[in-house]
UniProtKB/Swiss-Prot annotation:
Keyword Magnesium tagged: yes
Pfam families (alphabetical): polyprenyl_synt (PF00348)
Protein name: Decaprenyl-diphosphate synthase
Binding site for isopentenyl diphosphate: K183, R186, H216, R233
Length: 456
């Protein structure tokens, strides 16, 4: 009997201990989950407001934007990059850049100032920039037209027979956008950076400018088909002038001709850089098409880098490689291209809300119509959470687009987006200041200002 009582007592004690242990374990797990949620929320807040998180935690903005130091690693993808710590040099660079709080509750939002380290250098006019590379841009356009119409790149040793030349209709369609006056920002960046690093533009660097412009133009042709755009650069788009089928073939042809020119440079590192840029451009377009109404700044910045930033990043890296620069200068050039590329696309997304069709040379307010959530509406969601429902259904119901535009206008989304673009521009300028002083370097600073202050 005594043994039975003791056993029952022990049993009750054991049950109590087990029960308390389970309760404590459940409480501990809940606490851990709560802490993880708080950490994730803190990352998102710091991510969207550009606040620096605690030193012990990685800064998500920096992680996303510090890209391509491992460009030669073919398996390198953004998802892996997000788990890497910020290199020491980049942390030091962060200290030199003033990051204002863009998530204030005040009625007014402090405007981040553009860095102008050389006394109003940013106020110089754009024509000063293009005048320096005017002859190179002219030669570039001539070579592109020759490549398109004759089916052979300039200075190539390959000579096709007359029957192998480009079909006249394909040649005409492919030349369509090159005959118009575009911004030509990307080749200008390549040419100015080439001059800044080696005082002159080598033949291989001029070819690089041609490649970048052909890849970019091909992406515009394909974009117009995907977006069903009716205008481009103030004229009817190729897909509307001809057909979607011919437009797709035209874009494919431009990419093929760009690949031929790339092969004549005969530099495996440059080939890998530009091939990666082309692959990531497609990946970014695919990511946008399959967004499924994701409410995520992380997703937005990844797509922005892939669609726009990667081509500028890799073209700057390639220009540095072709100049014979050391690894430090190559990495500085890569950082410059990456940050300027992100700034450029963020401004494009901003102009979709603030610009006019006449100024931009293309339709505006199309992102919402296409169901795309870019920086202005993502920032506005912080103040108007009801926007999340609209984003998730990709603004597909009647009145969604108008309601989203109304709430963005009422929010600080426009100002925060402008601050974000300026922040990336400032980082690009900080990279340029690490290069030796030259007229071309200074003009790149001016160009960086133009990128974020433009109205089209």
């Amino acid at each position: 009997m005594s043994r039975l009582i003791i056993n029952k007592s022990n049993s009750r004690i054991c049950n109590t201990i087990v029960k308390n242990y389970l309760i404590q374990t459940k409480y501990t797990l809940q606490q851990q989950q709560h802490q993880q949620q708080q950490q994730q929320q803190q990352y998102v807040r710091s991510y969207c407001s550009l606040q620096q998180p605690k030193p012990s935690k990685p800064n998500m903005i920096e992680i996303v934007t510090h890209f391509f130091d491992k460009v030669k690693n073919k398996s390198f993808i953004i998802e892996n990059y997000l788990n890497n710590p910020i290199p020491e040099q980049q942390q030091q660079l962060n200290k030199n850049i003033k990051i204002n709080n863009t998530d204030k509750d005040n009625d007014t939002l402090e405007q981040i100032q553009l860095l102008d380290p050389l006394n109003n250098l940013g106020k110089r006019k754009g024509n000063e920039i293009f005048k320096v590379v005017e002859n190179d841009l002219s030669n570039m356009t001539h070579n592109i037209m020759k490549t398109i119409t004759d089916g052979v790149s300039a200075n190539s040793t390959y000579s096709p027979s007359p029957s192998k030349k480009t079909h006249p209709i394909l040649s005409s369609i492919s030349s369509y956008y090159f005959e118009l006056k575009g911004k030509r920002i990307r080749p200008t960046i390549v040419l100015l950076l080439s001059k800044a690093l080696s005082s002159t533009v080598h033949g291989s660097q001029l070819k690089l400018a041609e490649i970048v412009e052909m890849i970019h133009t091909a992406s515009l042709v394909h974009d117009d088909v995907i977006d069903e755009a009716s205008t481009r650069r103030d004229v009817i788009s190729i897909n509307h002038s001809y057909t979607n089928k011919l437009a797709i073939l035209c874009g494919d042809y431009l990419l093929a001709r760009a690949s031929v020119v790339l092969s004549t440079i005969r530099n495996p590192d440059v080939t890998e850089c530009m091939s990666t840029a082309l692959a990531e451009l497609v990946e970014g377009e695919f990511m946008q098409a399959k967004s499924n109404g994701v409410v995520s700044f992380d997703n937005y910045l990844q797509k922005t880098y892939l669609k726009t930033g990667s081509l500028i990043t890799n073209s700057c890296r390639s220009a540095a490689i072709l100049s014979g620069a050391d690894s430090n200068i190559i990495n500085i050039s890569t950082e410059f291209g990456k940050n300027l590329g992100l700034a450029f696309q963020i401004v494009d997304d901003l102009l979709d809300y603030t610009g006019s069709a006449e100024e931009c040379g293309k339709a505006t307010s199309v992102d919402l119509t296409l169901g795309l959530a870019t920086a202005p509406v993502l920032y506005a969601t912080q103040e108007f959470p009801q926007l999340e429902k609209l984003i998730k259904r990709k603004f597909s119901e009647i009145g969604d687009v108008e309601e989203a535009k109304r709430l963005v206008a009422l929010s600080k989304g426009i100002e925060k987006t402008r601050n974000l673009a300026i922040e990336y521009c400032n980082r690009a300028i900080q990279s340029l200041l690490k290069l030796p002083q030259s007229e071309s370097r200074d003009l790149l600073i001016t160009l960086s200002h133009i990128v974020v202050t433009r109205t089209k």
